[in-house]
Swiss-Prot record:
Ligand for members of the frizzled family of seven transmembrane receptors. Probable developmental protein. May be a signaling molecule which affects the development of discrete regions of tissues. Is likely to signal over only few cell diameters. Keywords: Developmental protein, Disulfide bond, Extracellular matrix, Glycoprotein, Lipoprotein, Secreted, Signal, Wnt signaling pathway. It comes from Homo sapiens. The keyword Signal applies. GO terms for molecular function: cytokine activity; frizzled binding; signaling receptor binding. This is Protein Wnt-5b.
């Protein structure tokens, strides 16, 4: 009997530890700036053990690649900022919480919003690591070694220092996915379905950066004659990556886990998602009202657009509760003039405008 009690207690503690780990995230590196590589003292382990939100596997990678951690933090921050831009006019606006969970309890639900957040943060890491390689900030990588594109004109040179998106992709996959791959849930369980969902969306985010990287060229020659061009691989602007992932969010596929431990479409009439698509396993919670159990902050106090019929319009944003009007003073640059040579001088103009907030 005592042995059964011990086994039950151990299982309970293991579940509690898993829940505690899941409540935190490596995303918290965005909110807690990581020291630059040159600032590390000898011996990485104490530094890595103090970083919040890392899983055991990610902590080991931190010890092996300590100089990467600052750029993982930058990538997470880039992803969060892009998330907030893309959802700035939605009921859920990608708000962050002041703790290691970053987004609060809302991320415990396998919704479309969670899918997008995983994708855009994984994309942010690929972006940051790829660029750090090009800039010579990491000892394990350098400029891109991508083969010369076949369609590049023969007289154009290939070999400028490009963004190392291959390395960025591989490292982001190893680090970001480590958290999911070390989990061991029963095959066909809801928990395993959530792991598969996260892995799919992480991959979709990484592929968005990888696929959108393109050839950039610079002209050389007397008086801008462009008699010679040097070309290299360059990352797309991250805003374009965010736009692409937002499109994937809008067309995300509803999935469920099978007994064999695979994800399948809830509606088999829809097209099977590719590795570049987002998937979700839970319906989105009600973002209209504040709900501590789901993590929804509600829309009370949010600004809305009285004349818009879209999601930012007062009718939809305020969920039919109505809105309050108030006057706001806005200061803008105006009457700008160019002076030779070479600067622009502007005046400051104030304007009183009507604004609206949800009840």
């Amino acid at each position: 009997m005592p042995s059964l009690l011990l086994l039950f207690t151990a299982a309970l503690l293991s579940s509690w530890a898993q829940l505690l780990t899941d409540a935190n995230s490596w995303w918290s590196l965005a909110l807690n700036p990581v020291q630059r590589p040159e600032m590390f003292i000898i011996g990485a382990q104490p530094v890595c053990s103090q970083l919040p939100g890392l899983s055991p596997g990610q902590r080991k990678l931190c010890q092996l690649y300590q100089e990467h951690m600052a750029y993982i933090g930058e990538g997470a921050k880039t992803g969060i900022k892009e998330c907030q831009h893309q959802f700035r006019q939605r009921r859920w606006n990608c708000s962050t919480a002041d703790n290691a969970s970053v987004f609060g309890r809302v991320m415990q639900i396998g919704s479309r919003e969670t899918a997008f957040t995983h994708a855009v943060s994984a994309a942010g890491v690929v972006n940051a690591i790829s660029r750090a390689c090009r800039e010579g900030e990491l000892s394990t990588c350098g400029c891109s070694r991508t083969a010369r594109p076949k369609d590049l004109p023969r007289d154009w040179l290939w070999g400028g220092c490009g963004d190392n998106v291959e390395y960025g992709y591989r490292f982001a996959k190893e680090f970001v996915d480590a958290r999911e791959r070390e989990k061991n849930f029963a095959k066909g369980s809801e928990e395993q379905g959530r792991v598969l969902m996260n892995l799919q969306n992480n991959e979709a985010g990484r592929r968005a950066v990888y696929k959108m990287a393109d050839v950039a060229c610079k002209c050389h020659g007397v008086s801008g004659s462009c008699s010679l061009k040097t070309c290299w691989l360059q990352l797309a602007e991250f805003r374009k990556v965010g736009d692409r992932l937002k499109e994937k969010y809008d067309s995300a596929a509803a999935m469920r886990v099978t007994r064999k431990g695979r994800l399948e479409l809830v509606n088999s009439r829809f097209t099977q998602p590719t590795p570049e698509d987002l998937v979700y396993v839970d319906p989105s919670p009600d973002y209209c009202l504040r709900n501590e159990s789901t993590g929804s902050l509600g829309t009370q106090g949010r600004l809305c657009n009285k004349t818009s019929e879209g999601m930012d319009g007062c009718e939809l944003m305020c969920c039919g509760r109505g809105y309050n009007q108030f006057k706001s003073v806005q200061v803008e640059r105006c009457h700008c003039k160019f002076h030779w040579c070479c600067f622009v001088r502007c005046k400051k103009c104030t304007e009183i405008v009507d604004q609206y907030i949800c009840k």
